[in-house]
C-alpha cells in the first residue's frame, strides 16, 4: 500500500516536471554583444557551465552565470546541454566543491539580471528565454 502510494506520488511529480519543461519555450545561451565569441556547441557550453573549461574556444576567459536553483529554465538548460537532471547536477557540484576542484556558477535572480550582467562583461556567459533577447547580448546557442 505504501509502495503504491509512493509510486503514484513519484509518477505525479515526474509528470508535472515534464509538463513544465514542455511548456517552456526555447532558451538561448548568450554572450555580450561586444564579445568575440562565435557560435558554440552544446558540449562546449556544458564544459563551461560545469567548470571543465575555464575559457571560450577562442581562448578568452569564460565565467558562467546561472539562473536560480529550482527554476524551470535552469532545469531545461542543464538537461538540454549536459543531460543532467537537477538531482544529478546537485551530486556533481557536491563532489566538485568537496574535492576543491571547482565552485558552481554564480546565481542571479532571473533572466533580466543575467542579461544585464552579460551585456556589461564580455567574459560572462549566461542563458535566458529567447523572448528576453535584446541588442545588448548575442545568442551563441539555441537550446530546445
Residue positions per predicted region:
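Bacterial N-terminal signal peptides that target proteins for export
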Residues: 1-11
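N-terminal signal peptide c-region/cleavage motif recognized by signal peptidases
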Residues: 17-19
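Exported/periplasmic ABC-transporter solute-binding proteins
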Residues: 25-144
